[in-house]
Amino acid sequence: MSQKEQTLMTPYLQFNRHQWAALRDSVPMTLTEEEITRLKGINEDLSLEEVAEIYLPLSRLLNFYISSNLRRQAVLEQFLGTNGQRIPYIISIAGSVAVGKSTTARVLQALLSRWPEHRHVELITTDGFLHPNSVLKERGLMKKKGFPQSYDMHRLVKFVSDLKSGVPQATAPVYSHLIYDVIPNGDKTVAQPDILILEGLNVLQSGMDYPHDPHHVFVSDFVDFSIYVDAPEELLKSWYINRFLKFREGAFTDPDSYFHNYAKLSKEEAVDIATSLWNEINLMNLKENILPTRERASLIMTKSANHSVNQVRLRK
């Protein structure tokens, strides 16, 4: 089969960086360099150029989709003769540990909330829906943190389902990376946002992952648009190790940090531990649970060095 025939058969439209950047059209830049600095992750070089060439075209596309969804809701209300409840448009962001999902989520939240409609955009990470450490220890799952079985999936699905059902408000637990645990009584209330951005490792999982349980309900069943942030395995590993080293010099120095003992490690020891954590936990989770869901995404952003996106694939 020729490369041209393979391209025609793919469910995705493929864009290089230059082609994607051209789709920004005339969307104005609404973020300053100072704001971008606050939005980026500890390990990322997020530039004004990256926001302009990658995230502004994406926010334009999402705005079209969201506006179309609102029109569809209005048609349904007109047909039923009702004043409908506010149903949020849900965007999910998946990808490996250290790929930059959180930065993507924060940038999109900032951009989408600054469209002329001034939409209310909430951001929730699925980390909060991890079982507390006490439960994970009891079940022998501390080394499986981030794997599907480490989450309270019932509560996560109920949270998303409630919002899609138009309930006035729903609560989401909050996770602290400092204490490496869910914050007791630290729930966040989400009250009928226009847009919900849900960021997490496994938000693209579906019934295809559980063929033995056809009645299982998944977060992906309630998502309107899904994004997978992708990068080559070797880059992910280096980003994870570099992030660990930065935490060793920063967050781990806090006496309250769960990983405070790591602050005393030499650089060589820290690299060895980070490499082991990557190989034994995060790489395994990526290969077994995260990467197999990539082709279900509405859009795949592929990163190269310095967290710069060099390819975008959009589902037809």
UniProtKB/Swiss-Prot annotation:
HAMAP family found in the cross-reference section: Pantothen_kinase_1
SUPFAM superfamilies the record matches: P-loop containing nucleoside triphosphate hydrolases
Keywords: ATP-binding, Coenzyme A biosynthesis, Cytoplasm, Kinase, Nucleotide-binding, Transferase
Biological process terms in GO annotation: coenzyme A biosynthetic process
Gene Ontology CC annotations of this record: cytoplasm
MF GO annotations: ATP binding; pantothenate kinase activity
Enzyme Commission code: 2.7.1.33
This protein's record includes keyword Ion transport: no
Protein name, entry field: Pantothenate kinase
Reactions it catalyzes: (R)-pantothenate + ATP = (R)-4'-phosphopantothenate + ADP + H(+)
Pathway listed: Cofactor biosynthesis; coenzyme A biosynthesis; CoA from (R)-pantothenate: step 1/5
Family: Belongs to the prokaryotic pantothenate kinase family.
Alphabetical list of InterPro entries matching this protein: P-loop_NTPase, PanK, PRK/URK
